[in-house]
């Protein structure tokens, strides 16, 4: 099912793009990345809406913080009830990230299968896209891009996070903890894993984060005005 549902369609799409783009694997990866980002766009919109809504809830969260003081359990419960009432899911931003990881594993299989063909040209700029980047430049760019994308997401939720960060008992604040942990989790993971992955896969990850950052900026402007 995994093979027929995801691997084979991605392989055929990638080979099609490779052939129509002058058998340039780098350009094919760029085109494939753009297509996949557009496919995942509907899943990113709820995450952006949730982030903007969380910023709007900052005054209410601050009020709750003042009401409950050192009562961490009471505040956490009230916070969850407020989020539920406002239709805010603190995990809304996780699904697109999880799906990106799933797609990354699928593309690893696609690239391994494709690179096994002698007719595929893997040269792109200074890279052999079938091998890890010996200069470690691409993994660093991918990790930096992931960090930038995460930071771009932060202003939309910063209002809610600030409520927690201004108090001594901020460890009970869900938004604060989740935002703090997720900010560096994916960049570190990208850096570590990218060290061993074929450059073609790391190139996809880098381009995907660039498109994601641009997408977040646009969507935040659109839904932040509503």
Residue ranges, per PLM feature:
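Helix-loop-helix
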Residues: 1-226
């Amino acid at each position: 099912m995994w093979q027929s549902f995801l691997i084979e369609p991605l392989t055929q799409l990638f080979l099609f793009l490779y052939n129509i783009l002058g058998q340039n694997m780098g350009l094919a990866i760029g085109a494939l990345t753009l297509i996949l980002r557009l496919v995942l766009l509907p899943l990113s919109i709820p995450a952006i809406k949730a982030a903007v809504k969380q910023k709007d809830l900052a005054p209410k969260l601050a009020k709750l913080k003042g009401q409950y003081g050192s009562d961490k359990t009471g505040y956490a419960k009230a916070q969850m009830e407020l989020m539920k009432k406002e239709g805010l899911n603190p995990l809304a931003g996780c699904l697109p990230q999880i799906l990106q990881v799933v797609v990354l594993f699928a593309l690893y299989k696609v690239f391994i299968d494709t690179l096994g063909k002698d007719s595929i040209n893997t040269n792109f700029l200074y890279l052999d896209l079938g091998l890890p980047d010996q200069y470690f430049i691409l993994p660093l760019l991918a990790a930096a891009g992931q960090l930038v994308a995460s930071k771009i997401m932060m202003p939309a939720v910063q209002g809610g996070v600030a409520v927690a960060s201004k108090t001594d008992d901020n460890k009970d604040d869900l938004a604060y903890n989740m935002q703090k942990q997720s900010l560096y989790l994916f960049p570190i993971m990208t850096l570590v894993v990218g060290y061993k992955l074929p450059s073609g896969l790391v190139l996809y990850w880098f381009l995907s984060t660039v498109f994601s950052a641009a997408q977040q900026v646009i969507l935040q402007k659109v839904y932040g005005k509503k």
